[in-house]
Design a protein with these regions (language model features):
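Active-site beta-strand/loop signature of hydrolases that rely on acidic residues for catalysis
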Residues: 1-17, 77-81, 100-133, 167, ...
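N-terminal, active-site-proximal structural segment of metallo-dependent hydrolase catalytic domains
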Residues: 1-20, 200-240
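Residue-level detector of structured alpha->beta connecting loops
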Residues: 2, 45-47, 112, 138, ...
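Structured beta-strand-rich core segments of catalytic domains in phosphoester-bond hydrolases
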Residues: 5-83, 180-181
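Active site of divalent-metal-dependent phosphoester/diester hydrolases
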Residues: 27-42, 60, 124-184, 188-189
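Solvent-exposed residues in well-ordered beta-strands and their adjoining turns
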Residues: 69, 195-197
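Acidic/histidine-rich helix-loop elements
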Residues: 87-94, 155
Length: 240
């Protein structure tokens, strides 16, 4: 496989040392190593700038926001997330996860630039929260109509869930989406190939947003101290 961009999650110092050879192949990167299972590393063959690591709802949970410069001059917003799951050992409720996802989604909805969002969202594609995120952001799920692509848990074939996601704006068409073989992690890697084709891409239908969706999303976002306006907007362009 020869991807243009690699996104690694749950990275720590050990992982950073093991991933260091990638610096020779991927000259641009954004790294945030943490020992709490929420580290994040992004490697790119293309220039990354206007990049920022943020802690939107939790001082220990990073997210990454950046511009990817394509060789032909195209600029793409890339957002990488790994929100906290609802669980007895992490967070009893899904408040933080939902709020972070929806805040980023609302900031994306105003973007004039093409957008890709990737990460372990600790939620399945058909959940109410994921569907609400898609309505608020306007992004598309390339899996729709193509299968589940369950990525967790790689060690238990009888119990797997699609927790790792790639969403994209209507500027793109999907060329291929694959779950790659087990590489030793408890998550399978995912490979997505997107083609910039805005004329054809705009024919793809996103989920329709209603006023009640906006009200519910705002209610969830109000449960934290941050707001959609706090999300870094790489490229600085918004629809008028």
């Amino acid at each position: 496989e020869k991807p243009d961009i690699l996104v690694f999650l749950e990275t720590n110092l050990w992982w950073e040392q093991k991933l260091s050879p990638l610096d020779e192949v991927f000259p641009y990167s954004l790294k945030c190593l943490k020992e709490n299972l929420y580290g994040m590393h992004v490697y790119s063959r293309m220039i990354l700038n206007d990049a920022e690591i943020q802690y939107l709802v939790d001082k220990e949970i990073p997210s990454m926001h950046m511009i990817v410069h394509m060789p032909e001059g195209l600029r793409i917003r890339l957002h990488c997330l790994h929100p906290v799951p609802p669980s007895p050992t992490e967070s009893d409720e899904s408040t933080d996860r939902d709020s972070e996802l929806l805040m980023v989604g609302k900031s994306i909805a105003d973007s004039e630039l093409p957008v890709i969002l990737a990460g372990d969202l600790n939620d399945v594609a058909w959940s109410a929260t994921t569907r609400l995120f898609m309505k608020i952001s306007g992004l598309l799920d390339p899996r729709r109509g193509r299968g589940f692509f369950s990525t967790f848990h790689s060690h238990y074939f009888f119990l797997r869930w699609p927790l790792d996601h790639v969403f994209h704006s209507q500027h793109f068409m999907l060329k291929s989406l694959r779950r790659l073989p087990d590489m030793g992690s408890d998550h399978f890697p995912v490979m997505a190939e997107l083609v910039y084709a805005p004329v054809h891409g705009m024919q793809q239908e996103s989920l329709e947003k209603e006023k009640s969706d906006e009200v519910l999303a705002q209610k969830k976002m109000d449960m934290t101290d941050s707001a959609a306006e706090d999300v870094h907007t790489p490229g600085g362009q918004k629809k008028s």
